[in-house]
């Protein structure tokens, strides 16, 4: 069985989205995992704690014996069934544990005894994690063009349409604002960084690119923060600003935050609960900026939001949301973005409407 253990092997695994059967405990997987990994643990969280305690108190031999005792009989059969099914479903995959140690070797040996030869990652998750960190540091050194613009200018779509674009908000599963949450929970910080590195590696491998196209983001995207090496490079990057008419921005925001989010919530939860989730999502977003709006203005906009939701529920029309969205943009989001942009005005190299910026970026 050929093991993969060179830096190039690790990068090739990430670029190819090689399926990884990660046999670490669920708590370890939740703290950080590779994008193409599935968690089929050798030991669950409680079993891992018990074996770890035994190791500290009685040594490695006793801990190994306890592990075999805990994962035996029907439990072992159930886990073997899951590993075997995963191996057959993913014949090009690999096994992975924390450091390429006993857990992945034990599972590998059990599979071998069952007639399945399956490689493992030498160095385990730790080695892959070091690869993603180093890859991000290296790839972030390439030139960057940032796409800026006020809320609703279609910055994310523009980035998505570039062959050398990386959608940071899509990877973070958050759109970066108070209303930015999606129906997908955000990943742990380590998993987000691993996903970002894998996406950068794949994009670079496809394009052999000269520069990155990214959205002009702050350090935080929801609960995830950008790797410092990338964030530092972004502060030095040229900025192309999308300046679309206000009416076009409103159309985009209506589609993205009202029509699409309502559809997504009802699709996920059903009509009744989905409507409640959608209402809570909008109220939570507005409440998140209550302090900055001031209590009186917040209460006024919250009342308009309630009225808009009542109309939407009764008629299906989202037009009523303009009564609170327009002042929110003009009084809060637009002034805030313009203030931020003024502080980096010397970085702005191009301004234009969406199609003009897209054409300018394409020519870089």
From Swiss-Prot:
The keyword Transferase applies. One of its GO terms (biological process) is tRNA wobble uridine modification. It catalyses: 5-methylaminomethyl-2-thiouridine(34) in tRNA + selenophosphate + (2E)-geranyl diphosphate + H2O + H(+) = 5-methylaminomethyl-2-selenouridine(34) in tRNA + (2E)-thiogeraniol + phosphate + diphosphate; 5-methylaminomethyl-2-thiouridine(34) in tRNA + (2E)-geranyl diphosphate = 5-methylaminomethyl-S-(2E)-geranyl-thiouridine(34) in tRNA + diphosphate; 5-methylaminomethyl-S-(2E)-geranyl-thiouridine(34) in tRNA + selenophosphate + H(+) = 5-methylaminomethyl-2-(Se-phospho)selenouridine(34) in tRNA + (2E)-thiogeraniol; 5-methylaminomethyl-2-(Se-phospho)selenouridine(34) in tRNA + H2O = 5-methylaminomethyl-2-selenouridine(34) in tRNA + phosphate. Residues 14-137 form the Rhodanese domain. GO terms for molecular function: transferase activity, transferring alkyl or aryl (other than methyl) groups; tRNA 2-selenouridine synthase activity. Keywords: Selenium, Transferase. The active site is at residue 97. Its EC number is 2.9.1.3. The keyword Transferase applies. Involved in the post-transcriptional modification of the uridine at the wobble position (U34) of tRNA(Lys), tRNA(Glu) and tRNA(Gln). Catalyzes the conversion of 2-thiouridine (S2U-RNA) to 2-selenouridine (Se2U-RNA). Acts in a two-step process involving geranylation of 2-thiouridine (S2U) to S-geranyl-2-thiouridine (geS2U) and subsequent selenation of the latter derivative to 2-selenouridine (Se2U) in the tRNA chain. Belongs to the SelU family. This is tRNA 2-selenouridine synthase. It comes from Escherichia coli O139:H28 (strain E24377A / ETEC).
